[in-house]
Every structure is written in C-alpha cells, then in structure tokens.
Regions:
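STAS-typified acidic loop motif
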Residues: 1-28, 46
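Short beta->alpha connector loops at strand-helix junctions that form conserved
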Residues: 95
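Amphipathic alpha-helical interaction surfaces in cytosolic regulatory modules
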Residues: 20-92
Length: 95
C-alpha cells in the first residue's frame, strides 16, 4: 500500500489480496489521514482479491471524501464484478 497527495487528491495504490486483516489495517490508516472531505482515488489494477471488509472501507471512504469524490481506478473484471454484485458501483466512480 502506498499513499501520496497529488493535485489535492489522496492517491492510494494497492496490490495483492485484501483480506479482513489487511482491510482493517487500511481502514485504520485512512481514518488517520482523512480528517476532512477531499478527493480520493484507489488505484486497483494490481489487486487480486477483496473481501467484504474492503468493501466496508470503500463505503467509509466514499462517505468521508464527500459526494462524487471517491474513485476506484484500474479495476480488473473479477474485482469489478464483486463491486457490481454488492451494488456499490453507483455509490462511487469505477473505471
């Protein structure tokens, strides 16, 4: 996991599996970093698995970032399917 500020956005780049433990670590980190609404991008092209705890983190970020300010970028078809099945693609941008 890497985090950087770019053009006023928090860009988070991820790789590998996001199981419950890793998702909880991510949530703790983001709760410290996101103290006010700001655009957030999750770069997901190298993510191979997400569990429901990761989906919960995404919902938290979408609410904290503000309306239309959270984007998932680089979703592979299997990962995008998880978000579609959970009905979350309308809550935030998915490309």
């Amino acid at each position: 996991m890497t985090f950087k500020e770019s053009d006023g956005k928090l860009v988070c780049t991820f790789a590998g599996h996001f199981d419950t433990v890793r998702s909880q670590e991510l949530e703790a980190t983001l709760r410290q970093r996101l103290t006010a609404p700001q655009p957030v991008v999750f770069e997901m092209q190298d993510v191979t698995y997400v569990c429901s705890a990761f989906l919960r983190v995404c919902i938290f970020v979408a609410k904290t970032a503000g309306p239309g300010q959270f984007t998932l970028s680089g979703l592979t078809p299997p990962i995008k399917r998880v978000f579609m099945m959970a009905g979350l693609t309308g809550l935030f941008g998915c490309d």
